[in-house]
Amino acid sequence: MSSGASASALQRLVEQLKLEAGVERIKVSQAAAELQQYCMQNACKDALLVGVPAGSNPFREPRSCALL
């Protein structure tokens, strides 16, 4: 039974390796350049870089009532 289990495990491993071999790969330098370009294009939308407008910030301290 151990040989049957190991044979099925090896079969699953072979199938997984076939799937991984078919994955399209790119060079790290190309991936880094694309990531840098994406970051530069979307920097204007990044709240950590440009901040959050005070009117739409859900985490700001609530104002107290002026009548009290």
UniProtKB/Swiss-Prot annotation:
Family: Belongs to the G protein gamma family.
Protein name: Guanine nucleotide-binding protein G(I)/G(S)/G(O) subunit gamma-10
Domain of life (superkingdom): Eukaryota
Record's subcellular location: Cell membrane
Propeptide: 66-68
Any one biological process term the GO annotation gives: signal transduction
Annotated positions of the Cysteine methyl ester modification: 65
SMART domains reported for this sequence: G_gamma, GGL
Tissue: Abundantly and ubiquitously expressed.
Keywords, sorted A to Z: Acetylation, Cell membrane, Lipoprotein, Membrane, Methylation, Prenylation, Transducer
Highest classification ranks of the organism: Eukaryota, Metazoa, Chordata, Craniata, Vertebrata
Lipid tethering residues (S-geranylgeranyl cysteine): 65
Originating organism: Homo sapiens
Record-linked Pfam families: G-gamma (PF00631)
Entry keyword annotation includes rRNA-binding: no
Subunit note: G proteins are composed of 3 units, alpha, beta and gamma.
One example GO MF annotation: G-protein beta-subunit binding
InterPro entries for the chain: G-protein_gamma-like_dom (IPR015898), GGL_sf (IPR036284), Gprotein-gamma (IPR001770)
